[in-house]
From Swiss-Prot:
PROSITE patterns the UniProt entry points to: ATPASE_ALPHA_BETA
Catalysed conversion reaction: ATP + H2O + 4 H(+)(in) = ADP + phosphate + 5 H(+)(out)
Protein name: ATP synthase subunit beta 1
Family in the record: Belongs to the ATPase alpha/beta chains family.
Pfam families per the UniProt record, alphabetical: ATP-synt_ab (PF00006), ATP-synt_ab_N (PF02874), ATP-synt_VA_C (PF22919)
C-alpha cells in the first residue's frame, strides 16, 4: 500500500461514533490531532482524515475508503501528519488512488519521494504569467478562445454534449505532441472512461508499458463508485504530483475530469459533517474550497502547469453556484452548447459564449483578433435575424443580411471538425488544423471568397482547401 509509513502507536484513540463515511474518534485531551491529520486504523489499511475538532478530545473525520466493518471501540493511531503520496518519476505510467496506492496491478509505487496533499499556493511574487499560446489543432478553440501555455481552461457543458470527448481530443493533440509531462486526475467520473483513457495512452506510447519510467503521464483516479472522501481529495493528490514536476522545472499538463464532481463530493462531506447548506444545497465553504484547489494550479518562475478542466453544468444552467464559482479562476472558458450539438455540429462549442483572456491584439496579433471578431460578428447577426427568418422567411431579408446569413451558416459548419478520438463513431479520419490554416480559412469565408461554394462543403472538414475539394465532388 502507499501509506506504509511507520505510525507512532503511542498516540491512540478509539472510535466513538460511525455514521456512513463520517467517523468520530476520541483521543486524550492533550493529544488531539490537528485538522487534516491522517489517522490509521489498527489492523486495517483504512485512512481517516480529521475535518473538525469537536472538543473534549473528540475529532470528526472522513473515511478515505469504505467504512464497512468499523465498530465503536476500534483503535485508531494518529500519524501526526497530512496524507502523503508518492511524487516524481515513480508515478509515471502508473494508475494510483487517492492515497497514492497503485490500482493497475503492476507492483508497488516507489515511496522514495513523497509529498503532503495539503500545501499553500505559491506566493504572488513567485507566479509567472504567460503570453505564449498553446495550439490545440481544434479550429473553434484556436480561433475564438485560444489557450495560454501555463493557463487554466474550463470545458463547460451539460450532460452528453461532449466534454470528455473534447478533453480526450485535447489530450490526443497536446499531450502526445507535448515534450513535457501530463497528470490526469479522474474525479468522480465513470470507471469505463478511465479505463479507455489508460489503454489509449498505452497504444499511443504516452504510457510505455515496457519501461514505465519513460512514460509521460501519471494517472490518479477516484471514480464515481468511491466514497465521498476519496472523490474530494483525489484532485489534490493529482495536483500534488503535478506540482512536484513543476517544481523540478518542467512544463506540466494537468487534466481534471470533472471539477463538478469535486464540488459534489464537498457537498456530500459537508452534509455528513452537519454543516448548514448554502445556495442550491451546496456547502457554505464552496468558494473557499474551490479557491484552495484552483490557487495551487498555477505557473511559477520555475515551471508551468497548464490545466484543462471539464466542468459539468447542472441542467445547462451556467449560473448554478458550482460552475459560476469555477468561472472566476479560469483564463479561457470553452462553453459547449446543446443547441449546437442538436444541429450535428461537433465539437459543439458555442463561439459566442466561449471566452479567452488571450484574445487581444497584443497577444494573438491583429490578424487573428480581427478574424475572430469578424466571425463572431457574423454569427451574432445571424442569431439576431433568426426570429425574422422563422416568421417571414429568407426572401424578406435585405441583400446584405442574406449574405451575412449565408456566410454565418458556412462559418457554423466550418467550425465543425472530425476528431481523432471519434474516428470509431464517425468513420472519417481525425484532422489537426494549424492556427495559420484556421485563420486563413475563416478569413476567406468572412471576406466572401467562398460565397460560391455550397454550405454542405464546409461540414466536417479540416482546412479550407478540403472544403474546396469537397465542393468539386458535389
Amino acid at each position: 500500500m502507499a501509506q506504509e509509513t511507520l505510525v507512532d502507536t503511542s498516540i491512540q484513540g478509539k472510535i466513538v461514533q460511525c455514521i456512513g463515511a463520517v467517523v468520530d474518534v476520541e483521543f486524550a485531551r492533550n493529544q488531539m490531532p490537528k485538522i487534516y491529520d491522517a489517522l490509521k486504523m489498527e489492523g486495517s489499511s483504512l485512512t481517516l482524515e480529521v475535518q473538525q475538532q469537536l472538543g473534549d478530545g473528540i475529532v470528526r473525520t472522513i473515511a478515505l475508503g469504505t467504512s464497512d466493518g468499523l465498530r465503536r471501540g476500534n483503535i485508531v493511531y494518529n500519524t501526526g501528519a497530512n496524507i502523503t503520496v508518492p511524487v516524481g518519476k515513480a508515478t509515471l505510467g502508473r494508475i494510483m488512488d487517492v492515497l497514492g496506492a497503485p490500482i493497475d496491478e503492476r507492483g508497488p509505487v516507489d515511496q522514495t519521494l513523497t509529498a503532503p496533499i495539503h500545501r499553500k499556493a505559491p506566493a504572488y511574487d513567485e507566479l509567472s504569467p504567460s503570453q505564449e499560446l498553446l495550439e490545440t489543432g481544434i479550429k473553434v478553440i484556436d480561433l475564438v478562445c485560444p489557450f495560454a501555455k501555463g493557463g487554466k481552461v474550463g470545458l463547460f457543458g451539460g450532460a452528453g454534449v461532449g466534454k470528455t470527448v473534447n478533453m480526450m481530443e485535447l489530450i490526443n493533440n497536446i499531450a502526445k505532441a507535448h515534450s513535457g509531462l501530463s497528470v490526469f486526475a479522474g474525479v468522480g467520473e465513470r470507471t469505463r472512461e478511465g479505463n479507455d483513457f489508460y489503454h489509449e495512452m498505452a497504444d499511443s506510447g504516452v504510457v510505455n508499458l515496457d519501461k514505465l519510467e519513460d512514460s509521460k503521464v501519471a494517472m490518479v483516479y477516484g471514480q464515481m463508485n468511491e466514497p465521498p472522501g476519496n472523490r474530494l481529495r483525489v484532485a489534490l493528490t493529482g495536483l500534488t504530483i503535478a506540482e512536484s514536476f513543476r517544481d523540478e522545472g518542467r512544463d506540466v499538463l494537468f487534466f481534471v475530469d470533472n471539477i463538478y464532481r469535486y464540488t459534489l463530493a464537498g457537498t456530500e462531506v459537508s452534509a455528513l459533517l452537519g454543516r448548514m447548506p448554502s445556495a442550491v444545497g451546496y456547502q457554505p465553504t464552496l468558494a473557499e474550497e474551490m479557491g484552495r484547489l484552483q490557487e495551487r494550479i498555477t505557473s511559477t518562475k520555475v515551471g508551468s502547469i497548464t490545466s484543462i478542466q471539464a466542468v459539468y453544468v447542472p441542467a445547462d444552467d451556467l449560473t448554478d453556484p458550482s460552475p459560476a464559482t469555477t468561472f472566476a479562476h479560469l483564463d479561457s472558458t470553452v462553453v459547449l452548447s446543446r443547441d449546437i450539438a442538436s444541429l450535428g455540429i461537433y465539437p459543439a462549442v458555442d463561439p459566442l459564449d466561449s471566452t479567452s483572456r488571450q484574445l487581444s491584439p497584443a497577444v494573438v496579433g491583429e490578424d487573428h483578433y480581427n478574424t475572430a471578431r469578424a466571425v463572431q460578428g457574423t454569427l451574432q447577426r445571424y442569431k439576431e435575424l433568426r426570429d425574422i427568418i422563422a416568421i417571414l422567411g429568407m426572401d424578406e431579408l435585405a441583400p446584405e443580411d442574406k449574405l451575412a446569413v449565408a456566410r454565418a451558416r458556412k462559418i457554423q459548419r466550418f467550425l465543425s471538425q472530425p476528431f481523432h478520438v471519434a474516428e470509431v463513431f464517425t468513420g472519417s479520419p481525425g484532422k489537426y488544423v494549424s492556427l495559420a490554416e484556421t485563420i486563413r480559412g475563416f478569413k476567406m469565408i468572412v471576406a466572401g471568397e467562398c460565397d460560391h461554394l455550397p454550405e454542405q462543403a464546409f461540414y466536417m472538414v479540416g482546412t479550407i482547401d478540403e472544403a474546396f475539394e469537397k465542393a468539386k465532388k458535389m
